[in-house]
Amino acid sequence: GMVGSVLMQRMVEERDFDAIRPVFFSTSQLGQAAPSFGGTTGTLQDAFDLEALKALDIIVTCQGGDYTNEIYPKLRESGWQGYWIDAASSLRMKDDAIIILDPVNQDVITDGLNNGIRTFVGGNCTVSLMLMSLGGLFANDLVDWVSVATYQAASGGGARHMRELLTQMGHLYGHVADELATPSSAILDIERKV
């Protein structure tokens, strides 16, 4: 998906694969060729294979809440003590999890690591962006309250939904391309046609 693809690109750019031995799992492409990041080759492993997952020290998942809700509790109940790093929202409110946004809460992350926390999750994208811009104001007690309203973007649904959105945008553009190419055409007429 989109989140995983962006993560992989960033890890390549920052040479993170130089320091780890990655094993790649999939919920839908078991047995296909795995990415060759970090100089490793092989096939995609079964993301539902608890025994294989239990052998790992760290699991990074961008699979989504359904996967997390199914696999995470089973792993923890089996005694797995590894680090779970997750982009899904499922674990955000758990007492044994920390939402990670290191420019804002590095001290909380460090304290958690020092105190045995092993579950780290990404925050809501809109809230994370807001905190990146307002974090210093919060840290200096300069904000009484914030009211935020958002609309979940298509990107939150993953690559398939982004592709669908772009296809729909293309159809809309095709429907009004002539009018858009004419500077004198009225935008409200174009909007009504769409």
Regions found by a protein language model. Give the residues of each.
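N-terminal Rossmann-like NAD(P) cofactor-binding subdomain of oxidoreductases
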Residues: 1-194
